[in-house]
Amino acid sequence: MYKKLITFLFVIGALASYSNNEYTPFNKLSVKLYIDGVDNIENSYTDDNNELVLNFKEYTISIITESCDVGFDSIDIDVINDYKIIDMYTIDSSTIQRRGHTCRISTKLSCHYDKYPYIHKYDGDERQYSITAEGKCYKGIKYEISMINDDTLLRKHTLKIGSTYIFDRHGHSNTYYSKYDF
């Protein structure tokens, strides 16, 4: 039976600069990941039966489920300063179906000089979670999403704020932003 939707909200304190060397801080980078194939999870746990694993270790969160139909509808990435969205990114949908195998979606958010993040469950929404890291990114931010089947990488997306490219699985640039040129 196919399961519903889960949303991850990644929020991280950051510092960006324009090409004219005037530093413009943005205090939140929120990444919302809409995934089809997982439902009814707690903040963080490991199931010995491998029905569902939600691990968080070293800035990485992984979702593992057996016999799954898993993919993502979209990834919305917002750069926020003083509660105002100053830039937006979107990675389009990807649905990869592999029944009878272990499917894993691994997301990774990297930043220099940040503290250890934590997972938070939103009140009133059992399917929405966040990872928050406090600190400032002086050397850029990188966000990765990987879709893996039986240890075979099926698809990988990378967002860098700094050089600021979004790559598809073939390494081609979908979008280029020169605004945050470190």
From Swiss-Prot:
One of its GO terms (cellular component) is host cell endoplasmic reticulum. It is found in: Host endoplasmic reticulum. Keywords: Host endoplasmic reticulum, Signal. Residues 1-16 form the signal peptide. Its main location: host cell. It comes from the Viruses. Belongs to the orthopoxvirus OPG192 family. This is Protein OPG192. It comes from Vaccinia virus (strain Western Reserve). The lineage of its organism: Viruses, Varidnaviria, Bamfordvirae, Nucleocytoviricota, Pokkesviricetes. The gene is OPG192.
